[in-house]
Amino acid sequence: MTHQTHAYHMVNPSPWPLTGALSALLMTSGLIMWFHFNSTALLTLGLTTNMLTMYQWWRDVIRESTFQGHHTPAVQKGLRYGMILFIISEVLFFTGFFWAFYHSSLAPTPELGGCWPPTGIHPLNPLEVPLLNTSVLLASGVSITWAHHSLMEGNRYHMLQALFITIALGVYFTLLQASEYYEAPFTISDGVYGSTFFVATGFHGLHVIIGSTFLIVCFFRQLKFHFTSSHHFGFEAAAWYWHFVDVVWLFLYMSIYWWGS
């Protein structure tokens, strides 16, 4: 290893951005094949290569940060800026979905019956499963904060306990959302109501699955003593992401489930 006189991490050439891009192409193409031709072969290949890429890329980052010491305070500062910008881009991503929803619902056209929800649509009761989902995500926000404070205080047992509770609540939310989709009296093809409902809540559900995966990785890393009270940005980024998912759900609940019903 050559000596360096600066605090920045000079990353070695890596195949993972290329394999990640190829797996994303396979997944999106596979999704189209599944929708139009009922074939899941390409989608399965894309998901498999994506999972392998994520595993090996994260493995390399963990090696560089935890075992090789490349994540100096200057590098961590850059990672924090990167995570903040990523979350801002996600906020703008969801802004598009809310824009589509309010554009359609605030001034419903004659084709929709001049009312919202459109004629013939029976919306879900916001005081049933959606309210339970809201309480589950809010509880998970409390438990992830508990985990963060426990880590800052050096209490490993409480950190693992709180993190496990957060993951369990995230999985429970996903199962509730899946059951709600299964029992919904409308589909994604039921006009603009169905499309805005399923795209907005579906992408949020995808983000919950991504966040849960992020937290599961943190849980296993903490089992191996990877985090300390002063060096734990991987967990901190996961906590920021989880709080973002919480806040988006509150807006979804108030807009689509409560006001939109």
UniProtKB/Swiss-Prot annotation:
Keyword check for Mitochondrion: yes
Keyword Translocase: yes
Annotated organism of origin: Ovis aries (Sheep)
Location of the protein in the cell: Mitochondrion inner membrane
Catalyzed reactions per annotation: 4 Fe(II)-[cytochrome c] + O2 + 8 H(+)(in) = 4 Fe(III)-[cytochrome c] + 2 H2O + 4 H(+)(out)
Family statement drawn from the similarity comment of this UniProt entry: Belongs to the cytochrome c oxidase subunit 3 family.
Task performed by this protein: Component of the cytochrome c oxidase, the last enzyme in the mitochondrial electron transport chain which drives oxidative phosphorylation. The respiratory chain contains 3 multisubunit complexes succinate dehydrogenase (complex II, CII), ubiquinol-cytochrome c oxidoreductase (cytochrome b-c1 complex, complex III, CIII) and cytochrome c oxidase (complex IV, CIV), that cooperate to transfer electrons derived from NADH and succinate to molecular oxygen, creating an electrochemical gradient over the inner membrane that drives transmembrane transport and the ATP synthase.
Spans traversing the lipid bilayer: 16-34, 41-66, 73-105, 129-152, 156-183, 191-223, 233-256
InterPro entries listed in its UniProt record: Cyt_c/ubiquinol_Oxase_su3 (IPR024791), Cyt_c_oxase_su3_dom (IPR033945), Cyt_c_oxidase-like_su3 (IPR000298), Cyt_c_oxidase_su3-like_sf (IPR035973), Cyt_c_oxidase_su3_a-hlx (IPR013833)
GO cellular component: mitochondrial inner membrane; respiratory chain complex IV
GO terms for MF: cytochrome-c oxidase activity
GO biological process: mitochondrial electron transport, cytochrome c to oxygen; respiratory chain complex IV assembly
SUPFAM superfamilies: Cytochrome c oxidase subunit III-like (SSF81452)
Keywords, sorted A to Z: Membrane, Mitochondrion, Mitochondrion inner membrane, Translocase, Transmembrane, Transmembrane helix
Oligomer and partners: Component of the cytochrome c oxidase (complex IV, CIV), a multisubunit enzyme composed of 14 subunits. The complex is composed of a catalytic core of 3 subunits MT-CO1, MT-CO2 and MT-CO3, encoded in the mitochondrial DNA, and 11 supernumerary subunits COX4I, COX5A, COX5B, COX6A, COX6B, COX6C, COX7A, COX7B, COX7C, COX8 and NDUFA4, which are encoded in the nuclear genome.
Protein name: Cytochrome c oxidase subunit 3
